[in-house]
A protein has these predicted regions:
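Amphipathic protein-protein interaction modules
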Residues: 86-142
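Short intrinsically disordered terminal tails
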Residues: 1-4, 174
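Surface-exposed polar/charged interaction patches
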Residues: 26-33, 37, 102, 126-128, ...
Length: 174
């Protein structure tokens, strides 16, 4: 007996077959291959887990989606993690759609030539973007951001279409 006001959105997704169908439909305009852990490249996955590789028509920067006990999206150096629940699945679909449409890119920070981390930046960044403001909007974790703005380094943006990729040098503040 379900109370009428039960919020269906927080329901666990019990098995991923409906999700797989829904996702394949959402990705129907893309070149997608489906993989299981019976393949050597995917033998780290659990039984029953499925991986979708969305082929990038421009280069080898493919997008990887893994569906298992939780859902994962990999693009460039970014790894997005989503719980296997409806509202998080919807968030994942929005993120994937934004990447494929070029409306989101992977923002990576480097200081001293070392990678400090990556995040998904939900915007198309212009070549003359204000880096401090961009990092305010897109970078949640304080520490590497402060270090970058103080010591200098670089910000890389990776998009589905490599023609949109950007690299910004940040001069040290001394």
């Amino acid at each position: 007996e379900h109370p009428m006001n039960a919020n269906i959105n927080y329901d666990e997704i019990p098995d991923t077959s409906a999700v797989q169908e829904d996702l394949l439909a959402a990705l129907s305009s893309q070149h997608v291959t489906v993989h299981t852990n019976e393949e050597p490249d995917f033998d780290y996955m659990e039984n029953g887990d499925v991986a979708f590789v969305v082929k990038n028509p421009h280069n080898d920067e493919n997008l990887l989606i893994e569906l298992g006990g939780e859902f994962s999206v990999f693009f460039g150096l970014w790894h997005g993690q989503y719980k296997a629940v409806e509202y998080d699945y919807d968030r994942m679909k929005k993120d994937v759609a934004a990447i494929l449409a070029g409306n989101a890119g992977v923002l990576s920070l480097y200081t001293d030539g070392k990678w400090q981390g990556s995040t998904l930046c939900p915007e198309k960044v212009s070549a003359d973007a204000d880096m401090e403001k961009l990092l305010e909007r897109c970078w949640q974790k304080q520490e590497p951001k402060e270090k970058l703005l103080a010591q200098g380094g670089r910000v890389e943006l990776l998009y589905w279409d490599p023609a949109e990729n950007k690299s910004f040098m940040i001069p040290a503040k001394n």
